[in-house]
Design a protein with these regions (language model features):
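Non-catalytic, solvent-exposed segments at the cell envelope interface
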Residues: 1-413
Length: 413
């Protein structure tokens, strides 16, 4: 009996020690972004007020950096990086819903004067959105998003190419639906049409590919990313990953291996608490959509927000009100009538560019121009803040998008 008890004690001690070691290992993987926290503290007075009680607004940034382990194969590390993907994730106060809003990287935006890595200040510019991350890092990106939306960003997470691949591999791949066969030698991507499961390398090529798929627009690329994330969320939920330590550990290890977080989300305990808070959120209430946009009048390789739809979306999120999604954006290229044209509130599909981005090479430098239309925003000294656009009367605003319960080929599960 003593032997059994002693053996049990040894197992418990060793097991606890192993668990503690693994916890500390994962916890130590996460890099803390103190620089961004310090910069946001410096400009605290210009930031929006926090949202309603218990809501969380998290900015997810996919960096295209070529530095770091596993990223050099995607190009030369020239010391700069841009936000390849940026998503504003709103978690409702009661966690009954989660809304992920993609912000186009080529969206024209008012980027404030930001602190560069060398300590100098940039000038305020009206340029494509992803220039904010290149010039002033996460702090500049957060400030740009807050000015655009009027939403206080509570936390931010940055992940690179390597981290994305590892997370996909950790769940044994993610199922996608490919409408037409893809053969893209540059992206090392060769996929047949139909449903299939993609592992890390091919999954990364699939969500990043642009000019070789469809009409070459960033809108289609974001739609693919949203469908992919919806499929990933659905797989994690349906496989019971969050409740199974043997499945959860590889995912946490992958997620933390290339993760940079603000001081409020830089521990495994904080991240786990955040994720577990969504355990009872229905997949039908996990929504993915894109900020309402259309081609920018002065350069159809760029986008601009559609008003008043964009402000109605941001107003709903600020007030923690429900946002509906229905269908996908019409991606057929059409000429732009005029910059001030806007459709029915919330439900109109943005106009696509008259010239496909595949036919015109994208600019490599930021385009600093004046906006053709203020589009529902107002000037407040040097800072541009979102006007208090009211929500449309009668029911929730609805936008093109998808939910995590949708089948990858378009039918609700």
């Amino acid at each position: 009996m003593r032997l059994v008890c002693g053996g049990t004690a040894v197992v418990l001690v060793v097991g606890a020690g192993t668990a503690w070691f693994l916890y500390k290992q994962l916890d130590g993987n996460i890099r803390t972004d103190f620089a961004t926290a310090n910069e946001l503290e410096r400009i605290q007075a210009e930031r929006p007020e926090p949202g309603p009680t218990s809501t969380e607004n998290i900015l997810l940034i996919g960096s295209d950096t070529r530095g770091g382990s596993g990223n050099s194969e995607y190009g030369k590390d020239n010391g700069t990086q841009r936000s390849d993907t940026t998503i504003l994730l709103h978690l409702s106060g009661d966690r009954s819903s989660a809304t992920a809003v993609s912000i186009p990287r080529d969206l024209m935006a008012h980027v404030p004067s930001c602190t560069q890595p060398n300590g100098t200040m940039t000038q305020e510019k009206y340029v494509q959105f992803n220039w904010a991350f290149e010039s002033g890092g996460a702090a500049c990106t957060i400030r740009t998003v807050e000015r655009m939306t009027g939403i206080r960003v509570d936390h931010h997470l940055i992940v690179d190419f390597s981290g994305f691949k590892k997370m996909v591999d950790a769940v044994d791949g993610v199922e996608v639906c490919v409408p037409k066969a893809i053969n893209d030698p540059e992206a090392h991507l060769n996929l047949p049409a139909g449903k299939q499961t993609l592992l890390g390398e091919r999954a990364l090529g699939y969500v990043r590919a642009r000019y070789s798929i469809g009409d070459g627009s960033d809108t289609q690329r974001m739609n693919r990313q949203q469908d992919f994330m919806a499929s990933l969320v659905n797989k994690i939920r349906s496989d019971g990953v969050l409740l199974n330590p043997t499945k959860l550990y590889p995912l946490l290890s992958a997620a933390t291996s290339s993760l940079t977080a603000d001081p409020g989300l830089d521990s495994l305990a904080e991240l786990y608490e955040l994720v577990r808070g969504l355990e009872n959120t229905p997949t039908s209430a996990v929504r993915f959509l894109t900020a309402p946009r259309r081609p920018y009048l002065n350069n159809t390789d760029r986008d601009e927000l559609v008003q008043p739809e964009a402000d109605q979306l941001f107003a709903a999120l600020r007030a923690d009100k429900p946002v509906g999604v229905s269908g996908k954006v019409d991606e057929t290229p059409r000429p732009v009538a005029k910059a001030t044209a806007a459709g029915t509130a919330g439900t109109a599909a943005p106009t696509a560019p008259a010239t496909s981005p595949a036919a015109v090479a994208p600019a490599t430098e930021p385009v600093n121009v004046e906006p053709a239309d203020a589009g529902g925003a107002e000037e407040d000294g040097k800072s541009r803040r979102v006007a208090g656009t009211p929500l449309p009367p009668g029911g929730e605003p609805t936008f093109p998008g998808t939910t995590a319960d949708q089948d990858i080929c378009g039918k609700a599960q």
